[in-house]
Amino acid sequence: MTPTELNLKAKALLETHFDDIVLSGEISKITLHGSGHWYFDLKDERSSIACAMFKGANLKVGFKPAVGDFLELCGSVSLYPESGRYQFIATSMKKAGFGDLEAQFLALKERLQKEGLFDPRFKKSLPKFPKKVGIITSKTSAALQDMLKLIHQKEYFLAKIYIFDALTQGNNAPFSLIQALKKADDMDLDVLIIARGGGSREDLFCFNDENLAREIFKAKTPIISAIGHEIDYVISDFVADFRAPTPSAAIDTLFYSKLDIEQSLDLMEEKLMQLWNYKIQNYENLLLNLSKFFKFNSLPKIIDEKIKQSHNIEKQLNHLLANQMRYNELKLDKLQNAYLQHENFFNKSKKFICIRKNGKIANLEDLKSDDIVILSSQTSQKEAKIL
């Protein structure tokens, strides 16, 4: 028996015994193919099965299924002979409520939001030109290689990259991520990226861990959450300081390319030159206006003011000189009067006679008969005897 023969027998057996089955579960991964067919995985708490719903059947469905939807399917089990892979072929589909993963996600999201862990007030700003950047992800992941390749392509050599290896899938992933986060947060980094590439809802569910969310919230380092694809949302996206839709988008957000920096510098130089020329032109206009102002307005006023000041000074000097002249004239009159008085006294004193007795000036009442005296005037003197 060949593999083809075995697969065909198994296909016939499955389609015979597993026909018209009702299957319930949660979508953990889905592809809406361009051909119109839908391919998805349906899971419960322990297992999953690949499912397909072809275009002819899904046209009757009134909604587009998504990851996390809890569905009830009708259909049969079949096997694809070329690969030997069996799958459930759905012929009808309806929603059966929230899946367990989605319910857990929404409940935790609502509780943390009420506590304020998503409040924009607590979001830290990202650095403009980071020099120390940490990346928490699996060191063997394609996402890490894509990020490092993009950094190299951007030729951003200002930053040193620190890689912190952690599990990004499975039950042990939250603890591994928390340990890596604590280690990175103690290294005084400028920014930290928590990254993982795309995957199923179940694959990404470790980033919905409550303990991880609280560690992200209390970290002192600004954190970017870059998990899955643009349509994927996890709790770490809401509690982080910034959400990037993909790991590569986180690099685009954080790092300028060499060309971007050169263009920014050129633009800054151009703006500075425009500002410089504008300032110079303003100052030139100001100087020109001031020159005109002083030339046609202020200078004549200043000259007139100085002339008025000189006239006032001249008047003050003339007044002072006139006062001094009057003072000198009065003083001269006093001297002249004093001179005339002395001259009159001198002329009168020529007629006066001085009496001396024994060489001393004597008064008339002191003289006695027979006293010998000397009589003197300004022109002569005589000896005389008192009778």
Curated annotation (Swiss-Prot):
It is an enzyme of class 3 (hydrolase). Its EC number is 3.1.11.6. One of its GO terms (biological process) is DNA catabolic process. One of its GO terms (cellular component) is cytoplasm. One of its GO terms (molecular function) is exodeoxyribonuclease VII activity. It catalyses: Exonucleolytic cleavage in either 5'- to 3'- or 3'- to 5'-direction to yield nucleoside 5'-phosphates. The keyword Hydrolase applies. Bidirectionally degrades single-stranded DNA into large acid-insoluble oligonucleotides, which are then degraded further into small acid-soluble oligonucleotides. Belongs to the XseA family. Heterooligomer composed of large and small subunits. This is Exodeoxyribonuclease 7 large subunit. The gene is xseA.
